[in-house]
């Protein structure tokens, strides 16, 4: 796990060279027991580079557990920054991710399927959960907005998308449509309340300007 952590903050070959010479380098630097290294033992590292590496280890050490857990997804420190903005405490963030891995759908570029695969490995019991259904619906509408410029669809189309992507959650759809605070439903149209509120703000601003 120390190698995985190092590879997420410095180049993979450099991480391997360091680990080969100092197998416990991450813990030792974080604990303050390793301040200097023998540069002859580590190819490609001199004083300036070593100081930069030490700084990165210390800054990222608190989130090393999270980085190691999410490395199979290709999650980097930069991606985790968005989650840390919402929850700055790494210990609490890790707990939240373990409780509901679908929080990762907040990270741009991961996509629902990648997150879903990891989430079901961490929490197989989430296969037919409300958390999984909510995460898919939020992702579906965000993707719809980004790729096609639409912020809503018919209830029928949404149900079809759910059936095709998270069929195990189908029996929770009707309940969720009636008991949620994140969707706006009008007649047969459904979309994220967040988008609806923004559109209404823009509409009201334009209305005011036209007077």
Q: What role is predicted for each listed range?
A:
Residues 1-132, 139:
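Long, highly charged, low-complexity intrinsically disordered interaction regions
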Residues 26, 57, 61, 141-145, ...:
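Conserved NTP-handling cores and scaffolds of large molecular machines
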Residues 63, 76-79, 146-150, 168, ...:
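Intrinsically disordered or highly flexible coil/loop and linker segments, enriched in small
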Residues 134-152:
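Short amphipathic alpha-helical interface segments
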Residues 148-163:
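Short acidic, hydrophobic short linear motifs in intrinsically disordered regions
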Residues 152, 186-211:
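ASCE P-loop NTPase motor cores of helicases and related translocases
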Residues 163-187:
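Charge-enriched amphipathic alpha-helical scaffolds
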């Amino acid at each position: 796990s120390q190698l995985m952590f190092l590879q997420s903050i410095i180049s993979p070959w450099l991480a391997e060279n360091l680990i080969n010479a100092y197998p416990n380098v991450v813990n030792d630097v974080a604990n303050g027991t390793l301040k200097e290294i023998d540069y002859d033992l580590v190819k490609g590292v001199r004083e300036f580079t070593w100081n930069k590496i030490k700084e990165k280890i210390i800054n990222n050490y608190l989130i090393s557990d999270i980085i190691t857990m999410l490395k199979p997804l290709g999650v980097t420190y930069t991606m985790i920054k968005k989650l840390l903005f919402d929850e700055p405490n790494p210990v609490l963030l890790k707990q939240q991710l373990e409780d509901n891995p679908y929080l990762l759908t907040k990270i741009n570029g991961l996509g629902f399927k990648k997150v879903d695969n990891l989430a079901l490995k961490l929490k197989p019991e989430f296969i037919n959960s409300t958390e999984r259904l909510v995460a898919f619906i939020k992702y579906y509408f965000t993707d719809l907005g980004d790729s096609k410029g639409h912020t809503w669809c018919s209830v029928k189309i949404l149900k079809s998308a759910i059936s095709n992507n998270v069929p195990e959650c189908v029996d929770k759809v009707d309940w969720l449509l009636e008991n949620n605070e994140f969707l706006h439903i009008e007649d047969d149209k459904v979309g994220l309340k967040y988008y609806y509120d923004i559109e209404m703000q823009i509409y009201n601003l334009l209305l005011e300007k036209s007077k």
